[in-house]
């Protein structure tokens, strides 16, 4: 919808403060660049020739071609036919095409999809450098939470078309509270002993879930459990992963 490819069934779309209607749609899109999954190219043409087609259609200066090829580190491969490009090079060429007009808003859909670890790292570094170098806003859509964790500073999570979370990445991590998971030879007795000491706990999948304790309090509780003749089978510090938080927010359970 942001790119004008799909019309909303209700309401309206505003991009860069302007409505995406018939009067301003093209003016808005001139300030937007996009890379949607795996872009298509003319394989018999070189990378530079492919970009020249886009440059002509967009009406931007020809010098932008050389500049964006340098930005995505393809200036040394500009005379090579795209049919002989690796997948990572093709993705970078797609990013170069999206950057040709130096947009205010850059939309990237699964930009690291199908890349090997080296290609993922290179694409990630390129994407992260763009806001500071060119003052543009970059929106990345990805199902790889680890990639978002390393690239984004603001996050939005959508469930079946509904926005269920929108805030800073730091705020999302804030939902991942550290806690202790305790398993003893008798959790029921241990739970009563902990509550006598005003330590909140709840049972979950065979473990007692406790807040993080000071060293002094942890030592005190260890002595208390020993006095009640309770053996500690396992005590570990846990933290919810981004995947756990995502599944909680979307209400989805993992499935094969």
Residue ranges and their predicted role:
Residues 1-140, 145-159, 165:
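ABC transporter nucleotide-binding domains
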Residues 34, 60, 74, 132, ...:
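Residue-level marker of structural boundaries
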Residues 36-40, 176, 229:
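Short amphipathic alpha-helical interaction patches enriched in hydrophobic/aromatic residues
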Residues 56-59, 153, 230, 251-255:
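Non-catalytic alpha-helical coupling and interface elements of nucleotide-dependent molecular machines
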Residues 124-212:
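ABC transporter nucleotide-binding domain
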Residues 178-249, 256:
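Short, charged/small-residue-rich alpha-helical element at the C-terminal edge
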């Amino acid at each position: 919808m942001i790119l004008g490819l799909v019309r909303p069934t209700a309401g309206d779309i505003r991009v860069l403060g302007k409505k995406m209607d018939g009067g301003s749609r093209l003016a808005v899109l001139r300030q937007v660049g996009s890379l949607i999954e795996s872009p298509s190219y003319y394989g018999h043409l070189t990378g530079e020739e492919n970009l020249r087609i886009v440059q002509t259609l967009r009406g931007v200066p020809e010098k932008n071609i050389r500049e964006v090829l340098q930005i995505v580190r393809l200036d040394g491969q500009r005379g090579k036919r795209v049919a002989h490009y690796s997948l990572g090079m093709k993705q970078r060429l797609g990013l170069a095409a999206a950057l040709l007009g130096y947009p205010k808003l850059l939309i990237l859909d699964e930009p690291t999809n199908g890349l090997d670890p080296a290609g993922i790292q290179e694409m990630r570094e390129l994407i992260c450098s763009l806001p500071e170098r060119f003052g543009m806003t970059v929106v990345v859509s990805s199902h790889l939470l680890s990639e978002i964790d390393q690239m984004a500073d603001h996050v939005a999570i959508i469930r079946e078309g509904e926005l269920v979370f929108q805030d800073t990445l730091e705020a999302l991590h804030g939902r991942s509270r550290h806690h202790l998971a305790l398993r003893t030879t008798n959790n029921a007795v241990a739970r009563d002993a902990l509550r006598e000491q005003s330590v909140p706990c709840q049972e979950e999948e065979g473990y007692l879930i406790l807040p993080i304790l000071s060293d002094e309090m942890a030592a005190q509780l260890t002595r208390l459990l020993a006095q009640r003749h309770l053996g500690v089978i396992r005590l570990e510090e846990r933290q919810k992963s981004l995947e756990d938080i995502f599944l909680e927010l979307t209400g989805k359970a993992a499935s094969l």
